[in-house]
């Protein structure tokens, strides 16, 4: 595959006038990041020359990053065989595969990550909301606070943030209790939904006006007896798991900060069962 850049692509002084500027990536490919305006015909000439040179050099994937102000060059790249890989608010990434065999390029992001927050207080009341928008609006359904984890945000931090935004309640993350995977959920992408247990640090509710119709602390038994919960298989399993956790019969996954040579992340694991073996 071909992605992040590491070193400058060597070229002669003559090459520099006929090739697009590029850097080599870690996977035998090259990355070109366009930063200055260029006439499409000149861009086409340089791109063809570059592809010929990179082919002779045995390169594989070719990435072209176009900022939005240079989006007019995208048509030229597509005519040369490039295709869209992904886009962000300020750039478009295109890619081309030189070898004859099937490409091994990494796919665009395949999943969206969401959370559902199980927050229960000392009175065995669960924090629930009714939504102003979305699939459940206007149906009188009480549900856990839910939301999407932001780019670069840890799952546990996202769950705390979503609860605060939707209800005004401060919480402390406890554990991930379960997760669900579905496909073709959002613009054809798959979805990972993590059920998180959080401990309330405050009880006063201040519902988010833009998204939340109502919020309250609801007795747990009243919540699980809603027809919507009883008739929805996923929610029945979720409530069984949450009940088992509350009763001490179930252990979820706790985050452990871990590091690798070039990045940091979190390992979520069952601390109780692991420690019981030692």
UniProtKB/Swiss-Prot annotation:
A motif (Nudix box) lies at residues 147-168. Its cofactor is Mg(2+); Mn(2+). Induction: By paraquat, drought and high salinity. Keywords: Hydrolase, Magnesium, Manganese, Metal-binding, NAD. The keyword NAD applies. The active site is at 165 (proton acceptor). Mg(2+) binds at residues 162, 166. It comes from the Eukaryota. Its EC number is 3.6.1.-, 3.6.1.13, 3.6.1.22. SUPFAM superfamilies: Nudix. CDD domains: NUDIX_ASFGF2_Nudt6. Expressed in roots, stems and leaves. GO terms for molecular function: ADP-ribose diphosphatase activity; metal ion binding; NAD binding; NAD+ diphosphatase activity; NADH pyrophosphatase activity. One of its GO terms (biological process) is response to oxidative stress. Residues 110-242 form the Nudix hydrolase domain. Belongs to the Nudix hydrolase family. Probably mediates the hydrolysis of some nucleoside diphosphate derivatives. In vitro, it can use both NADH and ADP-ribose as substrates; however the relevance of such substrates in vivo is unclear. Confers tolerance to oxidative stress. Overexpression of NUTD2 confers enhanced tolerance to oxidative stress. This is Nudix hydrolase 2. It comes from Arabidopsis thaliana (Mouse-ear cress). The gene is NUDT2.
